[in-house]
Amino acid sequence: MEAKWFAREYEAGDESAIGALWRAAFPDDDEVGRTELEYWNWQYRDPPAGFARIRVAVADDRIVGHYAVIPVYMQVRGQVVLGSLSLNTMTHPDCQRQGILTKLASEVYDELGRAGLPITYGFPNENSVGALTKTLGWHYVCALRVYVKPLHADVIADRVLPGGLVRSMAKPLAQLGAALIGRSSSVPEPARNNMRWLERFSSDADELWQAVYNRSKIALTRNADFLNWRYPQNPLRGYRILAYEEQGQLVAYAVLRCMEQFGLRGGMIVDLVGHPTRDDALATVLAAAEEYFRQEDMDLAACLMHGDRRTVQSLRRSGFLPAPGRAFKEWHFCVRLNDSSTDADCIADADRWYVTFGDTDVI
């Protein structure tokens, strides 16, 4: 029997009910703290581009559906645009297949169009892609490539290979291949004096981003305000910021996180930015990141990098290769136009986009 529900805007005081919905919708989520008020405030209230747009569905005095986007500053072919990231979409298990999310999402998109936020992007799971593109006007852009470097060859082989006789026969070769690919990189001794752990980003991150940003691309604006909110201000996740500096100026950086990912202990390079004329600095940052991950006993290092060929080349030179097929999570990237101010062909063009793990909300 379908519950009688109605849609409305988020209201102050809904936070605990939204948390209860999260626990019902995602009972296997093991990231402790995602439903706490401090994290909710950080994710929805405190983004530097403004408060989230949230719609909820209510039935029997409880919240049974939730659709939200957070505003983000983007650069679209050189122009600053206020866009949005779709995240934390959920329906209570008792209220599936009642059109709740279609209703909530459509209302949010209408509001975004009226408010002048033309672009919404997101990373739906494979089961959601069809519904988004067929009924809600989304464009499928591409599957994003993750680059990985094995740090523990035996663990990688156990995870990737099938069981039984096939594993026993193939594992030695797989271990050898992973060991050869995953040879250690080391920081050049003269460059160690340039490496720093940062507590926060300063204005030189803005200058570095403007040097890196290709005006033909679409990308989130990686200025200090955004980076500090996204990483050091996150109350739940322990990011580390590794920087290469010269004469007090930021030349390259990587944001790192150690976590369980793909069924392995993953050293995640969440963001990776280097000055376009300083491949040496970027290589040094990658080597220092690998050293840190090995110290933390990670099984592999992983970096999602799309839209920057130079950085991909640096990853490959450092021993990173594309993750093999479905052995790891696939990242589907989709976008939606909420008004007619932006060219649909432009935003749906995979070659236009610059994307890293830092553009998601889950890494």
Walk through the language-model features, giving the residues of each.
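Conserved beta-strand in the GNAT
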Residues: 54-56, 62-72, 85, 90, ...
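Active-site/acyl-donor-binding loops of N-acyltransferases
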Residues: 2, 118-179, 230-233, 240, ...
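Short amphipathic alpha-helix that is part of the acyltransferase structural core
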Residues: 1-63, 81-85, 158-225, 266-267, ...
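Conserved acetyl-CoA binding element of GNAT-fold acetyltransferases
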Residues: 80-93, 264-276
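Oxyanion-binding "anion nests"
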Residues: 215-243
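Tryptophan-centric aromatic hotspots in well-structured domains and transmembrane helices
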Residues: 37-44, 67-69, 101, 138, ...
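Conserved acetyl-CoA-binding loop-helix of GNAT-fold acetyltransferases
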Residues: 91, 96-111, 279-291
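A short helix-loop-beta-strand connector motif used in the catalytic cores of GNAT acetyltransferases and
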Residues: 43-56, 60, 65, 133, ...
